[in-house]
């Protein structure tokens, strides 16, 4: 089985890598828990015939730590798992690095193919913000990424804190048959509920863009967040301001 070693990957969007986050300590209610420092990621091929997105990422990703140990991801740590059309999006907690997470973006053409990943955590990140959105919490950390795929460019924004994580994905609209209609937005865009094995998710199409919103929060909280999003054509999308 082919293994690709990516040392210090923070973002992988088919190309490029950057320095890893250092997460030697995790704050948990005032108690410091020492953890190994993550230094890289091994990416293996997804076994042919893999149907489940969670099985795909668990088979594919191994985290490497400074002390020489390796940890595979586990399906029990999946935070959300969403599929719309041929797009797959999954978030999973990282072993031995809590609270630390990974968001993995896949596409499927017969088999699951990873298009990008983002690793992030709580330690050392900037302050929580709100950006004029109706968030599940008063404010949350925000991290974004962009996958410059010639076939279908994708932008992602993940809003998170110690326990909750919501990702907003925007890409060019395409014909989709997934989901159950929920209601219409003021602009007439129909929202569709996704049947997810983990977390809740919905999507809608507006101004020639498909917007997917998914996370480990209630559907009501997702709908409230979606109601607060600006138009996809807004330069600041998904935010109302830059601060």
Feature map (PLM): residue ranges:
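Surface-exposed amphipathic alpha-helical segments
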Residues: 210-243
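Hydrophobic helical h-region of N-terminal Sec-dependent signal peptides
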Residues: 6-11
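Repeat-associated, polar segments at repeat-unit boundaries in modular proteins
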Residues: 102-123, 219-229
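Positively charged n-region of N-terminal signal peptides that target proteins for export
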Residues: 1-4
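N-terminal, intrinsically disordered, polar/charged segments of Gram-positive cell-envelope systems
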Residues: 18-79, 86-91, 116-117, 121-143, ...
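Exposed beta-strand-loop-beta-strand "reactive/processing" segments of non-cytosolic proteins
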Residues: 68-115, 199-203
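Short, solvent-exposed recognition patches
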Residues: 60, 79-81, 87-95, 121-206
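C-terminal motif of bacterial Sec signal peptides marking the signal peptidase cleavage site
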Residues: 13-16
């Amino acid at each position: 089985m082919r293994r690709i070693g990516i040392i210090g990957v923070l973002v992988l969007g088919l190309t490029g890598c950057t320095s890893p986050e250092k997460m030697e300590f995790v704050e948990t209610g005032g108690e410091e828990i020492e953890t190994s420092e993550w230094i890289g990621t091994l990416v293996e091929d997804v076994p042919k015939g893999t149907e489940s997105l969670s099985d795909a990422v668990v088979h594919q990703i191994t985290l490497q730590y400074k002390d020489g140990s390796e940890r595979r991801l586990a399906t029990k740590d999946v935070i959300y798992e969403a599929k719309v059309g041929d797009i797959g999006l999954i978030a999973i907690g990282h072993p031995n690095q809590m609270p630390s997470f990974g968001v993995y973006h896949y596409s499927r053409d017969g088999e699951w193919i990873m298009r990008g990943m983002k690793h992030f955590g709580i330690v050392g990140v900037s302050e929580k913000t709100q950006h004029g959105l109706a968030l599940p919490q008063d404010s949350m950390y925000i991290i974004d990424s962009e996958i410059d795929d010639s076939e279908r460019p994708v932008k992602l924004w993940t809003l998170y804190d110690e326990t909750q994580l919501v990702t907003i994905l925007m890409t060019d609209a395409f014909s989709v048959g997934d989901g159950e209609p929920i209601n219409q937005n003021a602009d007439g865009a129909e929202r569709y509920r996704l049947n997810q094995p983990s977390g809740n998710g919905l999507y809608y199409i507006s101004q020639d863009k498909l917007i997917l919103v998914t996370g480990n929060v209630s559907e009501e909280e997702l709908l409230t967040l979606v109601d607060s999003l600006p138009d996809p054509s807004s330069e600041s999308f998904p935010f109302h301001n830059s601060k």
